[in-house]
């Protein structure tokens, strides 16, 4: 279908809100983003990393999804059957914490509601926030196939989760056992490592005496957590530490509790650290747990799940753990067993959701046995069907982690999530694990715990495609997926788990490539956080500058694997770029004279400028396509920017005005054809980055098809590449630029004619200039041009050197020297004042000591800038005085 637009439908000013209004809904109505599932077309699929249904998406999500959308839009235009699958994560503790906080406002706890009612309330939250997330996806312009939207708790994915759990259990790869886990005493649940935020806390090292049972002395131990002392079951020393050789095998009388504990030898102990003697608390420290296993030590839990001390803590039973810490230290002092207290800055884990200090805690949990699964996944990386990490260095990061993996704690003491499909017989205690409920259900009690959120999201690439139904059309057609886009911070928690689960259950890699990006940081390189107050809401950016500005800024602001420094100045710069495109497009449209798509005719292209812009267009098509395949979107952005801003807008459009405003109708029509053809192709190249504005411009241009979203990706036309014209145009551009720079230096407008003398280095350069003299006349405005090997610069000439020539412009005919010197001396006075002012500040010790570093740095930059400007003006004055 060909749609023609004879009237210009583009307002004078680029207003992103107007341009973006209505387009997304139209795209959805027309089902442009709906994958066909057509086996005749080559498939291309990306599954969105499912955001948590907990609220607003942040700038990291915007970056992540923009990259995915760029890839899928590009592939759709290249003719692939493209699926960009949306979905959301139930997010376990994150969502439950939000819902509990909301209930708390009404003085209601989840226990007041009961499990079933609380889960119903959480589903209501999910529905509300899922809609909010979809609105944000719409604002960003993501080309998602909503007919395939999934949720980690929907029926299909729940079936997949049960299947995986039961299969792994039956293989002996899921087991129930005691282990040290991260425990949140406020939420009363285990936490994954990613849910623990480490903060540097100013604490204390307490040095204490542990008396030997035989009364012959004591060992000095140091701890940051005295509250765990009631759980000590040994003191460890290094087996080769000569200081303690005679004590190994003897016992300590644990103070206060008066429990006899052994002195054991273990290489875990660092001889040089502290006294070289370490208290061992197997139930409250992961390293101590391992030491305890090696020495068959008892494990004594001394806290309740809420962080208060329990009956094993003796007299401290019922106290909050931090109150107990103070009382234990006081008791050591009273017993004369306190040596000293030293300040100690150390990293302390806090719950990401509740803020509570995380307790290493021995708990009965469900685990995945990771070693065999990791080995299988690592074997995949030795085959041609490996997952390709982009950049490749992250493969080593992944492999190192998999080589050193620990068993994965998958149970969580929550109500919101996939309930563990395990039941315990009320009388016999027998365990039943199955995809379906046991018979005689009333005789069984289901496990109260739910699965770690990452358990279901690890199945995301294949569960969303219909697995465990391996005959599902989407599973057959779109799996394995093509590209996963994600941050380097979750390679361990998500990427690795998707790989081993996919290998185990499908025999395939989950995705062919994984594009790893960094973190979004502020303009100073700091991580965005609430405490710094430097977070940015992407929707606010869109409301001010438009989605296209934000998308292009995010996509082109970094290389794969690198962090992105975000600033409003960069977004504003992109907005200016789009405004330039808008204005150039309006100029083109106003000069097409109602041209229809089938009237575009490039058969009469003879002008060097026309051949040059078509050559540059094809070079740009080739570069953008090639760089896009390698995910080098920063380079794609620079390539497009240079072509559009420099080549097309600054040069070709200016050159095109000559035939457009002339009398030659054939030349006019050819120029219109080149303008329409080039702008149409350029909009298609730019479309994945800026979907809204490119659709608007493309619809106004002569075009073929219903929407740019499904228009054909531009292909290189070898017949349009003319290197001779490219060389000629490069020659003309450098000469014209040099002349313009000289005019600027001596403050002479283009309207004033000049005498121009050019001394070429060789015949080829000379011929190019002579054959294209009209360009020099049009853009340099000379009253006289001399192109000769014999010309030499006069004493009064301004000169410039370009790659193939020397350029001379005699000054006496150009300016009134006395007037120009007077003007420059006035400017010099201005810069002298600015230099004096800024140096006055920088020489003021009070300013230097009290002003923030960033302010001082800014003043130093000003000083350099003002000194440079002063030197430049002085140099120009001296040059003119010599004349």
From Swiss-Prot:
Enzyme category, top tier: ligase
Keyword Metal-binding: no
CDD domains found in the cross-reference section: Anticodon_Ia_Val (cd07962), ValRS_core (cd00817)
GO biological process: valyl-tRNA aminoacylation
Major localization listed first in the record, in broad terms: cytoplasm
UniProt keyword list: Aminoacyl-tRNA synthetase, ATP-binding, Coiled coil, Cytoplasm, Ligase, Nucleotide-binding, Protein biosynthesis
Protein residues bound to ATP: 530
Cell location: Cytoplasm
Reaction(s) the record says it catalyses: tRNA(Val) + L-valine + ATP = L-valyl-tRNA(Val) + AMP + diphosphate
EC number: 6.1.1.9
Description of how the protein assembles with itself and partners: Monomer.
Domain notes: ValRS has two distinct active sites: one for aminoacylation and one for editing. The misactivated threonine is translocated from the active site to the editing site. The C-terminal coiled-coil domain is crucial for aminoacylation activity.
Annotated family: Belongs to the class-I aminoacyl-tRNA synthetase family. ValS type 1 subfamily.
HAMAP family: Val_tRNA_synth_type1
Purpose: Catalyzes the attachment of valine to tRNA(Val). As ValRS can inadvertently accommodate and process structurally similar amino acids such as threonine, to avoid such errors, it has a 'posttransfer' editing activity that hydrolyzes mischarged Thr-tRNA(Val) in a tRNA-dependent manner.
PANTHER family linked: VALINE--TRNA LIGASE, CHLOROPLASTIC_MITOCHONDRIAL 2, VALYL-TRNA SYNTHETASES
Name of the protein in its database record: Valine--tRNA ligase
Annotated gene: valS
